[in-house]
Every structure is written in structure tokens, then in C-alpha cells.
Regions:
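Periplasmic polypeptide-binding modules associated with outer-membrane biogenesis and secretion
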Residues: 1-124, 137, 145-184, 210-213, ...
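Glycine- and acidic-rich phosphate- and metal-coordinating loops
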Residues: 106-110, 166, 195-199, 285-289, ...
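A generic structural motif
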Residues: 60, 147-152, 189-200, 202-204, 292-296, 313-328
Length: 390
């Protein structure tokens, strides 16, 4: 970590005075400290140099710190820009510089497919039967216009700026979602991020139907490595209706039946210290958020959730077995003196919450109908084991 990447190691053997024993000692002589002269990027046919460099934690002129180099390599792998199947999506090599104590760092990346078009469907305990048509590109460039139709079809357009584009249409019998979002994680290569999304969300719960149509803008900043703060204003039109197939409807649903215009802002802080963003095997992550909303929906909501990952054991050629455990805490209150609307309350149960319970099955119930109507406080502590391939 201090730049001493070469050393002279001498081994010495001495025989003990008694018995068949040999004492082995090593003497280590550190050579000259090395410094970084240049950082070279190779292999990036589509990804811009600046998009790669902003992920690195080492710079020309610094002492050669192998810990920083490993951290930069990890961050590059976690971007998803490069070919994970190659085994080494972002290699780091040393090259002799202009003097004996100078080294050039060569970052050798292998471009991968960052755009994913998915057609699918299935059945989930939380959402019922559903279909899914979505496209996600983690290395999008809204300014990289195609020069021809062939240029577009070969994937040589709209690539290389590290922006994240998501298009999704997911119809279902219990939930339908339409969403478009675009995020720039490093505006002008600064620590600031910006994003915008449009969404239309329909959900058929057991006791009511909800449609949410709106837009969200987010502005964030990376305070330090792996620690982010984000401010997200949102304008949302929420429509609540009773289920036609329900004979008795809870009064909490009837109280909010109709349209509600909600204007809110959420301040969130996220810490992510895991070895891999997509399939973590060690480390932890956590998020804390505060939301304040007004107009027709006057609430203040606080939520904190965290997850810890540990590798229990690893079987060669089978992968690692990882256990994750964590918890969620939330509290919501009305700022108008009225009750918190049923669609802003907390529920537990189902996949991603409490296994063994049906979706939103853990909740206070209406005294007359017995239906789940949500609560103002949420506390969930959960362990979860999962198998990881690598």
C-alpha cells in the first residue's frame, strides 16, 4: 500500500540444538518506492475513457497503492459495462515508466453487452400471474445518435456514456407497471447524479384498487466511496377505488376513495460496501430515507433498512453458500391531524419481506371486515440463505 511493490527476500535455515528441528527465517529488504506515472485505458471500443477513469481510485503522481488498484478494479467490474463471462472484465497490468521508480498502470477492459431486452412472464406470490417486456442499458449515451440504420442495429449508437436507461411494460392480473427512466450517475464526471422517471402503476389489492400515475426527478451526490445522498421530488396522481368483488369494504378504503394529488420529496442516504453489486458474498448495505408530502396526501415517513452478507462455505465448481440477514424499520405519521391514508401505511409478508406469510398478510385488520388495513410502524428482522454461483 505504500508503493513498495518489489522486495528482496532471503531465506535462512539454522538447525536446532536438540532433535530434528530446523529454524527457518526470512529477511525482507524493500526496494525503492514506486509511483504512478500514467494510467492507460485499453480495450474500450465503445465506453468513453472518462467513464472508466471516474471509477478508478488511483491517479498519476501518487504512490503505487495496490489496495487502491484492487478497489478500482472492483468498482469497474461492478459497473456492468464489461464482459463478466470473460473471468477478467477489467484487468490491471504494470508497465515500466520513464524511470526505475515509475510505473504505468494499464487498465485492460473487455467490452460486454450492456443492453438487455427481456421477454418473459411467470407467477409470483406477491404479484400473481404477469408478463414482462423490458429493456435496460447500463452504458447508455443519449447524445450518441446513430449515423445510419445499420449503425443502430449493430449496437454502435447510444453507447458508452455510462447512463442507465430502463423501459418496462409489465402487465398482470394483480399488477401492471409501465415505467421509463434515465439516470446519469456522474453528471459532467462530477460526484453528482441526476435522473428522471415517468411511471404508471396499477395494483389490485385484496381490499382496494390503486392507480398511481406520476413522475420523479432525482439529484444525488457521492459523498465518499460507496456512500450516496439523494434528493427526489415527486408528483403523483393516486386513484383509489373499492373492489367490485368485495361485499364489505373497510371504512379506511371508503375514506380515501377517489383521486389524490400528492407532491412530495424524499431525502435518502445509501451505503453499499459489498464485494459484488449483482451477487454479493460479503459486506453490507443500508439505506435510510425521509419523505415529506403535501397537497392531498399530508404525511411524513421515515424508513431504514440494512442487509449483511456472509459466506458460510464454498464448494469447488458449485460456488458459495451465502447467508444474508438484516432488518427494516419504518414509521409514518399524518401532518394534517387526520389518519394516515391506507395506501401510505406499512405492511409485511411475502417475498422480500417475511417468508411464510402471504403478501401483505402481516398487518392490523379492520375490526368489522377482518381485512388488512396496514399500520403506522414497521419492524422486520429476517435471515435469508441463498446460493451464489461465484
Amino acid at each position: 500500500e505504500q508503493g513498495y511493490i518489489t522486495a528482496l527476500v532471503k531465506e535462512k535455515h539454522t538447525f536446532g540444538a536438540e532433535g530434528a528441528k530446523v529454524n527457518v527465517s526470512f529477511s525482507v529488504e524493500e526496494k525503492d518506492r514506486h509511483y504512478i506515472e500514467k494510467v492507460k485505458i485499453v480495450g474500450n471500443d465503445k465506453t468513453r475513457d472518462n467513464v472508466i477513469r471516474r471509477q478508478l481510485t488511483f491517479y498519476p503522481g501518487e504512490k503505487l497503492d495496490t489496495e487502491k488498484i484492487r478497489d478500482g478494479q472492483r468498482r469497474l467490474s461492478n459497473t456492468g459495462y464489461f464482459d463478466m463471462e470473460s473471468g477478467m472484465p477489467a484487468g490491471i497490468n504494470f508497465e515500466q515508466g520513464s524511470t526505475a521508480d515509475r510505473q504505468n498502470i494499464v487498465v485492460d477492459v473487455k467490452e460486454g453487452r450492456t443492453g438487455m431486452l427481456r421477454f418473459g412472464g411467470g407467477y409470483g406470490a406477491n404479484v400473481g400471474a404477469f408478463g414482462d417486456i423490458s429493456y435496460t442499458d447500463r452504458n447508455f449515451d443519449v447524445m450518441d445518435m446513430p449515423k445510419s440504420w445499420e449503425d443502430f442495429m449493430q449496437g454502435n449508437a447510444f453507447r458508452g456514456a455510462g447512463e442507465i436507461l430502463t423501459l418496462r411494460f409489465s402487465p398482470g392480473f394483480e399488477r401492471t407497471e409501465i415505467m421509463v427512466s434515465l439516470t446519469n450517475p456522474a453528471v459532467f464526471d462530477s460526484p453528482y447524479s441526476a435522473g428522471v422517471s415517468l411511471f404508471n402503476f396499477l395494483r389490485w389489492y385484496e381490499v382496494y384498487e390503486e392507480q398511481s400515475l406520476g413522475s420523479r426527478v432525482s439529484v444525488g451526490r457521492e459523498i465518499q466511496r460507496d456512500f450516496f445522498v439523494r434528493l427526489s421530488p415527486e408528483l403523483n396522481l393516486i386513484d383509489i377505488d373499492r373492489r367490485d368483488d368485495k361485499e364489505d369494504t373497510p371504512q379506511d378504503v371508503l375514506d380515501v376513495k377517489g383521486g389524490h394529488l400528492k407532491a412530495g420529496v424524499t431525502l435518502s442516504a445509501t451505503m453499499k460496501k459489498t464485494d459484488n453489486v449483482f451477487a454479493p458474498t460479503k459486506g453490507y448495505e443500508g439505506e435510510s430515507s425521509v419523505e415529506v408530502a403535501g397537497l392531498d396526501v399530508d404525511i411524513a415517513k421515515y424508513k431504514f433498512q440494512t442487509t449483511k452478507y456472509n459466506t458460510l462455505f464454498e464448494i469447488p465448481k458449485w460456488g458459495k453458500h451465502v447467508i444474508s440477514y438484516g432488518g427494516t424499520f419504518g414509521v409514518v405519521e399524518s401532518t394534517s391531524g387526520q389518519e394516515v391514508p391506507i395506501f401510505e401505511r406499512f405492511y409485511a409478508g411475502g417475498y422480500g419481506s417475511l417468508r411464510g406469510f402471504r403478501y401483505r398478510g402481516v398487518s392490523p385488520v379492520d375490526s368489522k371486515t377482518g381485512d388488512q388495513v396496514g399500520g403506522d410502524v414497521l419492524i422486520v428482522i429476517k435471515p435469508n440463505g441463498c446460493g451464489i454461483g461465484n
